[in-house]
């Protein structure tokens, strides 16, 4: 059981998620915010992180250099872009810092790079830090085992108009969980959207539909549909704080782990 505060740093502090992470760090008594990093040339360099997040002064001026903050934190929390996350993970591996990665949109090669860095430092990488979503994945395993081979499976996800990647990392993870449970290869059975004359649906496929609109924080539904009945398993997030709190929980857990690549299922003791 930890008795000392976990020292964290946050990258991309000016973004919507970054500001929420700062607020979460302020709220949690066992978290100490040591640094907030922004891109070089940002007009926010030197601004107090707490003032930026609207939670009052925290005496943490925003910097543009991880090197300058190297002695101020033990775990980096990163919700940026795949390219930036790779740079940050490389830096952490070289400097003995753990890292929690909530970034989505990685390609296969980038994921392999993260795995290589994780041989040198502890890494939690998860497309969704919300506790409820990670429970959702366990429920999907059960549903797929019981109904998967006898139903049409669709995954529907919705996010705000500013989200850059589609389908979301969470939706893809849902597909991976279902496909793995059923012994299928998601790369071969996934159908991303439909248009025109598509013909009768192939039951071996897993369909994906994406919504980008307004300020939707995050909604995900897995649909198992047969003739005469269907089951829908849904998670809806109404605030980014659920992701931020999950990231803080991951940081608190990760600081006590050896080098390796972990996910939120392990953080939460679900596997």
UniProtKB/Swiss-Prot annotation:
It is found in: Cytoplasm. (S)-2,3,4,5-tetrahydrodipicolinate binds at residues 160, 169-170. One of its GO terms (cellular component) is cytosol. Belongs to the DapB family. It comes from the Bacteria. NADP(+) binds at residue 39. The lineage of its organism: Bacteria, Pseudomonadati, Pseudomonadota, Gammaproteobacteria, Alteromonadales. InterPro entries: DapB_C (IPR022663), DapB_N (IPR000846), DapB_N_CS (IPR022664), DHDPR_bac (IPR023940), NAD(P)-bd_dom_sf (IPR036291). Catalyzes the conversion of 4-hydroxy-tetrahydrodipicolinate (HTPA) to tetrahydrodipicolinate. Pathway: Amino-acid biosynthesis; L-lysine biosynthesis via DAP pathway; (S)-tetrahydrodipicolinate from L-aspartate: step 4/4. The active site is at residues 159, 163. Keywords: Amino-acid biosynthesis, Cytoplasm, Diaminopimelate biosynthesis, Lysine biosynthesis, NAD, NADP, Oxidoreductase. NAD(+) binds at residues 12-17, 38, 102-104, 126-129. HAMAP family: DapB. This is 4-hydroxy-tetrahydrodipicolinate reductase. The gene is dapB. Its main location: cytoplasm. It comes from Shewanella woodyi (strain ATCC 51908 / MS32). GO terms for biological process: diaminopimelate biosynthetic process; lysine biosynthetic process via diaminopimelate.
């Amino acid at each position: 059981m930890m008795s000392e505060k976990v020292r964290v740093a946050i990258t991309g502090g000016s973004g919507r998620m970054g500001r929420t992470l700062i607020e979460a760090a302020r709220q949690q008594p066992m978290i100490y915010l040591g640094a907030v990093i922004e891109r070089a040339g940002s007009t926010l360099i030197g601004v107090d992180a707490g003032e930026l997040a609207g939670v009052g002064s925290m005496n943490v001026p925003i910097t543009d250099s991880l090197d300058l903050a190297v002695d101020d934190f033990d775990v980096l929390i990163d919700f940026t872009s795949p390219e930036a996350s790779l740079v940050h993970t490389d830096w952490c591996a070289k400097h003995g810092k753990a890292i929690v990665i909530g970034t989505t949109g990685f390609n296969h090669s980038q994921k392999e790079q993260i795995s290589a860095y994780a041989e040198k430092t502890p890494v939690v990488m998860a497309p969704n830090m919300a506790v409820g979503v990670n429970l959702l994945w366990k429920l999907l395993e059960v549903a797929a085992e019981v109904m998967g081979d006898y139903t049409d499976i669709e995954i529907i996800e919705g996010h705000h108009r500013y989200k850059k990647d589609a389908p979301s990392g969470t939706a893809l993870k849902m597909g991976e969980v279902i496909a793995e449970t059923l012994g299928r290869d998601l790369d071969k059975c996934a159908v991303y959207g439909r248009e025109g004359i598509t013909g009768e649906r192939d039951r071996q496929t897993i369909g994906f539909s994406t919504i980008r609109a307004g300020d939707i924080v995050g909604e995900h539904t897995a649909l198992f549909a047969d003739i005469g009945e269907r089951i829908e398993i849904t998670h809806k997030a109404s605030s980014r704080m659920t992701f931020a709190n999950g990231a803080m929980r991951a940081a608190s857990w990760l600081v006590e782990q050896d080098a390796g690549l972990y996910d939120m299922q392990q953080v939460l003791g679900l596997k």
